[in-house]
Amino acid sequence: MSKEEFPHEKDLKDEVTPDKAPKKDPKAASKEEVKEDPAKDYEKEIAELSAKNKDLEDKYLRSEAEIQNMQARYAKERAQLIKYESQSLAKEVLPAMDNLERALAVKADDEAAKQLQKGVQMTLDSLVKSMKDQGITEIKAEGETFDPALHQAVQTVAAENDDQKDHVVKVLQKGYQYKDRTLRPAMVVVAQ
């Protein structure tokens, strides 16, 4: 018999029987139930986004603070550069001042030498005045308590009394300060 002769009969191949029915996994069913609660997914996502937002906000605040610190450091460095702009020139001029002082230390015997010394003295005085106007001053050393920030001990001698201990007894080379910085420490002899 053919299918055409019995149209009301079904093809047994197409029929679903209990043993051919797709089996449902109980774990899959519970997963489907979990997926059905979208509120938990949104809460989790909100928590993650909040944490990420807090992290980004923290990074932003740190970056902003770092920028402010850099700007403050830049302003301070710029102020230091302006404050000490003449420092290198002053260091270059100090040896010339030393030479002028040495020239004045030589005894002048005749009138021509005395006139030359007078010119050297005027030049030195003018140079010292210009240095003072720029904030460059001589470090007071002789008779002062030895200060390693201002003095360089080249030699030590025995102190004649207790008051003289750790005091400068002789200056071998003058020292100079530029505002609050030591340009060149005074080379001194210290009593011990």
From Swiss-Prot:
Q: Which UniProt keywords apply?
A: Chaperone, Cytoplasm, Stress response
Q: Where in the cell is it found?
A: Cytoplasm
Q: Which Pfam families match?
A: GrpE
Family listed = Belongs to the GrpE family.
Q: Does the keyword Chaperone apply?
A: yes
Q: What does this protein do?
A: Participates actively in the response to hyperosmotic and heat shock by preventing the aggregation of stress-denatured proteins, in association with DnaK and GrpE. It is the nucleotide exchange factor for DnaK and may function as a thermosensor. Unfolded proteins bind initially to DnaJ; upon interaction with the DnaJ-bound protein, DnaK hydrolyzes its bound ATP, resulting in the formation of a stable complex. GrpE releases ADP from DnaK; ATP binding to DnaK triggers the release of the substrate protein, thus completing the reaction cycle.
The subunit field of the Swiss-Prot or TrEMBL record says:
Homodimer.
What is the name attached to this protein's record?
A: Protein GrpE
GO MF annotation terms = adenyl-nucleotide exchange factor activity; protein homodimerization activity; protein-folding chaperone binding; unfolded protein binding
The cellular component terms of Gene Ontology attached to this UniProt record, alphabetical and capped at eight, are:
cytoplasm
In this UniProt entry, which cysteines form S-S bonds? none
Q: Which Gene3D superfamilies match?
A: 3.90.20.20, Head domain of nucleotide exchange factor GrpE
Tell me the segments the record calls region Disordered.
Answer: 1-43
